[in-house]
Every structure is written in structure tokens, then in C-alpha cells.
Amino acid sequence: MREQIYQRPSWDEYFLMIAKLAATRSTCLAFPVGAVIVKDKQVLATGYNGPPSGSNHCTSQGFCYPELSSCDASKALPSRSVHAEANAIAQAAKHGICTNGAIIYVTLEPCIYCLKLIISSGIKEVFYETSFNSGGKAALRDLFIQDGLVSLKQVSLSDTIAKKAATFLLDPTSISKVSR
């Protein structure tokens, strides 16, 4: 029997990596976040946090505050940003893509406002990489979960898959691996 020398990423790792790549498009220096909406193991839409399409980026307007400790702190400051989850849902809507019954992968646990939007768009499962301190809104999040409206699960990349992804990003991909 041939020994398996190639480990494929799990579906969760695969879609989380796509969300992480989407986050690289963010101009938010405080919280670069990416999201990908998936149904039947197919990507429906991606999103990242930033200003609405066609609008100037926060960084180009001098409204970027990378020292913020939370998204809530931006309420006192002029934030132009649309959250990654909302952006992905908007992209799906703009292109007539149904999100009912879909799954979303996000690099940061959704805030309560995005969670309400996710639920309203018919997305039933949320996979996130990093926890978000939702403060006093955690009870509302937990109520949505208890009511069966949505499920949340924290996921991460294994070290092996993260290293493999870094190699793929740094080296030419479509060449024979045997010659390396």
C-alpha cells in the first residue's frame, strides 16, 4: 500500500483559507476581516471589510484608526467600513445569488449586527477563526443559537495546512512537485 504523502485541507480549512485571502483586500488596518459564503461546497460570494463599492477607502481619507481595541470603539469615529459578512451578503444579492441554507466562513466572529444580517439572509451556520468580544450582546447571540436560528463554530488551520498554503503562495504552484 502506498503511503499518503499529501494531506489535503479539510473543507473547513479550505474555505477558511479563502476567507483569509479575501481579508488581504481589506484596507482596515485595525481589523482586516474576510468572509466567504458557501453552499454545497461551492463558493457563492466573498467579502472583506472596507467602504462601500465606489467610495474612497478610510486610509485615503485619513479616517483609519489602527489602535482601536474593538469595532464598537469606531462608533465615536467616522467609520466608512462595511463589515466583511455584510459585504459578502451584498455581493451575493447584487448578483442574484440565493444565500438561503448557505454557510459563511469569517476570519473574525461576527458582531451582533452582522449575525442578525446573516440570520435574515438564510445562512444557518457560521464558522469563524478568531473570537470577538461581543460584550453585553453575547446574551442576544446565545439566544439566537438556542432558538436554532444559527450555529457558530470556531475553526482554525492546522500547522501542516498553514505551512503548505504558505508554500503554495510563495512558490510557483503549477510545476511538477517531483522536481522540487
Each model region followed by its residue ranges:
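Zinc-dependent deaminase catalytic domain
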Residues: 1-180
